[in-house]
Amino acid sequence: MKIKMRGQDVKVFYKDKEALHGITLDIPEHKVTALIGPSGCGKSTFLRCFNRMNDTIEGAKITGLITLDGENIYDSQIDVVELRARVGMVFQKPCPFPKSIFENVAYGPRIHGLVKSRAELHDIVEKSLRQAGLFEEVKDRLHEAGTSLSGGQQQRLCIARAIAVSPEVILMDEPCSALDPIATARIEELIDALRKDYTIVIVTHSMQQAARVSQYTAMFHLGHLVEVGATEMIFTSPKEQRTQDYITGRFG
């Protein structure tokens, strides 16, 4: 099993508050790794370390080592814009740009210089929308605003936007929390299909979702990594009592 990303002794501080306490976790390639735990446990903070989104928070400081294919992503020589293309992110609330459906997907490849012609750009947009399971629904309305889509469609548009710049890893921070059950099921099916081409890390509050979509699960509590393992093992025979208590609804 190849390790795509690795965090070693990762600590995150917000000014003088330590939010993560020395997290060490491997992210296997072409698998879905779910990060679970109660609100405020640090799972989203840890997720944002993987593409340096915490850099945008005033007073945030990260120590430890995080690597992508063995390369330290916090090295001073790293181009953060390029890193965020390689490690894409889908947020909790669908956030399409105030542009057309087509331009939402075309924007990334264009600014990253990934296309040489209009025809090539059209191909990337169509391929990305198809991978996100959205093309057939929007192919006759690509000129319409991305915000005109339903919530579930907007989230799939955001996934297409992330895919369009050919990432290696896709981070998802509770991507279904604002969606209805039908839209959630579509996203979950999509996640399972996408792992053939991408490595996925998902933060979720839904135990059922973590069990359905992931191959590996990591349990967080109060800024600590409680345990990590194959999802089936975590949900059927966890080693730690805190994991058992959380999964069975005794706290959270």
Swiss-Prot record:
PROSITE patterns: ABC_TRANSPORTER_1 (PS00211), ABC_TRANSPORTER_2 (PS50893), PSTB (PS51238). Transmembrane segments: none annotated. Gene3D superfamilies: P-loop containing nucleotide triphosphate hydrolases (3.40.50.300). It catalyses: phosphate(out) + ATP + H2O = ADP + 2 phosphate(in) + H(+). NCBIfam families: 3a0107s01c2. PANTHER family: ABC TRANSPORTER I FAMILY MEMBER 17. This is Phosphate import ATP-binding protein PstB. It comes from Bartonella quintana (strain Toulouse) (Rochalimaea quintana). The gene is pstB.
